[in-house]
Amino acid sequence: MQSQVRLPSNGNPALSFPQNEIGGPVHWKTYLEGCSPCSFPSLRTVCPSQSWPASVSITIGDSIFRRLEHFSDKTGISVATVFRASWGLVLRIYTGQDSVCFGDMTTAPGGIDAIGCVGVCRVELSDTAVISKVLQRIQAASANKLAIPHVPLSDAVLSKCMPSASLFNTCMLISGGGERPEKTSSTFEKVELGYDDQYDIIVRGSVEDSGASAALSYRTSFLSEEQATSIANTFERAVSDLIGIENRIGQICFLSDLDKSQIYTWNKDPPLRAHSCVDTLIHERCLSQPTASAVNAWDGELSYEELNHLSSKLSRHLVTLGVGAEVFVPLCFEKSRWTTVAMLAVIKAGGAFVLLDPSHPAERLLSICQKVSARLIVASAQHAKLAEDLVTSIVEVGDDKADWLTDKGIKAQTQTRTRRSAAPGDALYAVFTSGSTGTPKGVIIEHGSFHAAVFPYTEAVGLNQESRVFQFSSYAFDVTIFDTLMTLISGGCVCVPSNTERWSDVANAIQRFRVTHSSLTPTVARILDPKDVLTLRTLVLGGEKLVTSDITKWVDQVRLVHLYGASECPIMSIQSMTGVASDFQTTDHATGSNCWIVDPNNHDRLVPIGTIGELVIEGTIVGRGYLDDPEKSSATFIRPPGWLCQVRGSGYHSAVYKSGDLVQYTADGSLRYIGRKDTQVKLRGQRVELGEVEHHVKLTFPNATDVVVELVVTIHASSSRAPILVAFVLISHEADPDPESIRTGRGEGLSQILSEPTDRFCSQIPIVQSQLQQSLPSYMVPGIFLPLMTLPLTSTDKINRKLLRELAGALSREELESYQPSTGPVRAPQTTTEKLLQQYFARVLNIPVEQVGADDHFFQRGGDSLTAMKLVAMARKDKHKLTVQDIFDSPRLSALACVVRSGKVDGNKEPPLEPFSLVNKHRDIIRAAAQQCQLPVRVIEDVYPCTPLQRGLISETLRDSKAFIAHLAVSLPPDIDLQRLQEAWTTVANANPILRTRMVLSASHGLLQVVVREDIRWIVSKNAEAQDFFVGVGKPLVQLVLCCHREGNEVPVQLLLMVHHAVYDGYTLPLIFEQVKAAYNGGTLAPRPAVPFIRYVQSIPDGTGYWNSLMANLQTPIFPALPSKSYQPLPNAIMRHTIITPGSHRQYTPSTYVRLAWAITQAYHQGTCDIFFGTVVSGRNAPVTDIELMTIPTVATIPCRVTLDFQSLVQSALRKIQDDAISGIPFEQLGLPHIRRLGEHAMLACSFQTLLSIQPALPPSTDAWFEQPGSTIDYRANATYAINLFFGLEGDKLKATALYDFNVVKKDKMQSMLVDFGNILQTMHKSPNSLIRDILAVPQQMRGPINSASL
């Protein structure tokens, strides 16, 4: 038998050889277990029009060869092993992976006629790995492969071992005697296997008695000759260092002499030092062009002479108030000409200014003022009240606030105070950015640093005396500072629009002010049309990632400039975009500084050209550091590393800034931006750039030659017609359809656009989606993947995206499901009750009725406790008795039909409660409530106790005003009737007391809920982000904002719902939105009182017996352990992980699976089988009539204990956890403070530091109004423990988000736990009848106690 083998790069047939060794496939399966794909990245910025094979020599000189021979004789490590390890090291630094693999082709020892064997070489590397151990492992693995020389890594074997068909794109060919220390002569040139077109890079090596030779073969479309030479030199350096260093991998320097020389040439000139101060440069302009316009604002104009006069007067006044060097002065202004006066006045006084955005929360502004130790603040009259709350001493500046223009207010004794002339090393300004802990982080920029950026910036942007610069950016961003000071230094005019113009009339403002230059984010630039801003000559884009359309839209209309910088180092690089072909991910050489690329884990090592590393900036342009944060400053603003001192001299002391950006040098020394170090790059808002999704899908989907992603509305969508992201994946076929029929979209060619679904394609979809979750936000991961035979084209030979949208939109549900794994036949329901339940199942699970069978398992088909409640509600409406526990006990449709009971259910309803009947002394309480709410007594509708959940949430907010407040943005259709919408919300608020609820404090009852008769609060604004919402005692907990920011239109385009978590949970919002829709369409609403649930909570027994029994003899330490008993966890790191969970065998709720999987994970990492943690429950299983319709939050936090028997079945453990959960339903609402008081063991259980929150998948909205593209889940607002785990269900995916305190749990530990959790969860689904012991290898320290406990 002959087996044809295809190499993994492009699938062309290569070799035929016998495959008769049984052990071969087993060997490869074992060897490749856990292996990740390793792809060498293309270093080309622009691919040439033609491609051909090429090669460069790798110099293995006589001295290195003699060292290799000596090393081999001494250690027994072959030359081939050293070559393999060296190439593994090269792959590591170019891919950033510690685990790498590549093709391994070795000519058998029989000579030139021997058959080549294609395999894989895996190399596990890390900085701490011992070199000798690495070499020994590689050699041992190679020996095992040589034992089965005729069994290659065929596609069949590879497909069994790896989910991805593209495992590697580089290969090494070893010929001659390099495989063993003893020599076997063979000639490199005689080995002609013809593999050049199979891999992007091939490294060929040959060893003879006389010496060794090597070469690197490549495709010119993949590498340039210079890049290939650099890689070859890096390989040579790796070979030399591997046999010369006896310690660890981290000690190897991969930078070749050639690369070092080139990098030093690019950065040979030290950045020039700046010797002037900003006020001096602006003063020169004021003297040389006094009548020229300096500021043209909506509230007035100032010439340079007027600006100089006003700022000088104000500066003298500030000096008398103590402003001088290193004194920071906050400025609090709306957009105004007076802001520029105040900025320049502080500079002239010798101080440093701090611009505040008054729209930001007062707490943040106060924090900034406290950080800078502000003694006084300069503010406009409009924001004087706010300023007084920030700093006690205020100087008002404005048209009617100019007492400082005369010297009358200056005390005689301070008249003699004069400021010291500023020095280049003095602080010029501080700009605050978000800190990792939520506290604003201040960056100090000195005069010298700013001056160093002046000439490079003004030259690149083209600023001069004719320039009119648009000051668009918020005062919170340093772009405003550049737009102001750079313009004044250049003699131009600063154009200041009003806030209204900024948000709703940008184009007209640009025209009205005759703006020539503007700095905008790409997002803002996208809303402008070049035809509407004809005065604009230069557009500077920065702050966000560019896409191709940003260039094509503007490059032929204006001078387009791409600015790359950071607050810590204002300008890193500036690139002029000269054409559509410009690489917008690449920036030009450094501007006013030098750019170096270092090892991300060690800034004392430079990396070779083309490898990915961290960008560090050298030069005066670098800021001073972070205000009052020496630790962070020393980690980011570092002393010159040794390699820099070698270039500049030992006494060199220039500042060096570690940017945290991952970049690589291109062949000409420019920089290509890759991403952020150790973080994921975020998109601004939730805009989906289809090109970005296409890029990632193409990288991820095996053998995809092209990808098109479109937003499609399918014909089977519910009434909401919600669109879904569809990825069209081009797959290769022998014959393409007729291009003309496909171009026009007519004829038989249309049916040939989509390929038939195959098992291989369908099985890859969940794997690809899981991989995409690692690089894209969840909303950017396509939900549907369709294979294409060819790309349809328009008459102009462009991709016919419209045709693809129509094609996907026309597919039926059955056709779409054919691209998913097939399911078995359905047994139709027989009895009347079974048919009724079939209807219920279909409605709550959103699946066609005909696809629901009598044997269907409710939880297997996607049900959970939330959908179970909806099913119960449907049964009640049809006068059938059914409980959630019935569904848990009998989840199969046929079995559930046997327990459904007919009869009236409404008779069991408790009588309605009278207002105020749940509190004593209600008259006194009503008066106190009215006083705290600052409302008349007559509007107090009811008062009743808070739930334990509400008490806890409000208490946290009283300590931190931002805690547990959600901002949910809802897009509105253009034809919305505003009056009807507001009336609808009023109707909903009248029907739902929870929306009219406030919280008050009572001496006798503690925290109480007060329902008031009032309309819901509305605000109309131009800026959703500018709205503050403060929650406190007696304050409303709900506020609605209509945001009108559509260009040229005052119609609101977005509704912002600001709401406290004490009045909603994840279940209530869809209910409220459904009511709004019904009211908008003229429907009537039934009241949704919260009192029945409050009465139930008040009547719950204390639970002493239940909780003490559940937690009896609990002695397990808290996990994770805190540094000290008094330590307060502060979640400050986030990590995400997506797990594909098969639907089969899911006989229990997702919550049950999650609890057990986490219990096993925690047991593994804690070393005990008695586990406890916290969990959030929905509370909707409570026996309260119509609880599924109530809009009061019912979630609760409870402790959960799991005692693992590692000899028991997974099924048994799942059943035990689910039974415990059901039996605990009556005691869920007691609250942690109450449970904690029940006893010593209960107190320990409530001291958990790990909290699990499982959110079931909610059904899609029923109306397009209520899509929420602007809303985000703020996990930080709800996290107070050392480990907070949030789980979201989306089909067969479980999305885990861990928010944790990295001072308690290190990043690698958290990552390890999430990976273990995912593996355990998947195994539980796949093998529910396996032993818990078999799910995960039990640590050695656990085996003793676990065995004894189990036996």
Swiss-Prot record:
Gene Ontology biological process terms, A to Z: amino acid activation for nonribosomal peptide biosynthetic process; indole alkaloid biosynthetic process
GO molecular function: ligase activity; phosphopantetheine binding; transferase activity
Coiled coil: none
Pfam families: AMP-binding, Condensation, PP-binding
Pathway connected to this protein: Alkaloid biosynthesis; ergot alkaloid biosynthesis
Cited PROSITE patterns: CARRIER
Superkingdom of origin organism: Eukaryota
Keyword Ligase: yes
Region: Condensation (C) domain, residue numbers: 941-1340
Gene Ontology cellular-component annotations: cytoplasm
EC number: 2.3.1.-
Region (Adenylation (A) domain): 285-684
Family: Belongs to the NRP synthetase family.
Function summary: D-lysergyl-peptide-synthetase subunit 2; part of the gene cluster that mediates the biosynthesis of fungal ergot alkaloid ergovaline, the predominant ergopeptine product in E.festucae var. lolii. DmaW catalyzes the first step of ergot alkaloid biosynthesis by condensing dimethylallyl diphosphate (DMAP) and tryptophan to form 4-dimethylallyl-L-tryptophan. The second step is catalyzed by the methyltransferase easF that methylates 4-dimethylallyl-L-tryptophan in the presence of S-adenosyl-L-methionine, resulting in the formation of 4-dimethylallyl-L-abrine.
Protein name from the UniProt record: D-lysergyl-peptide-synthetase subunit 2
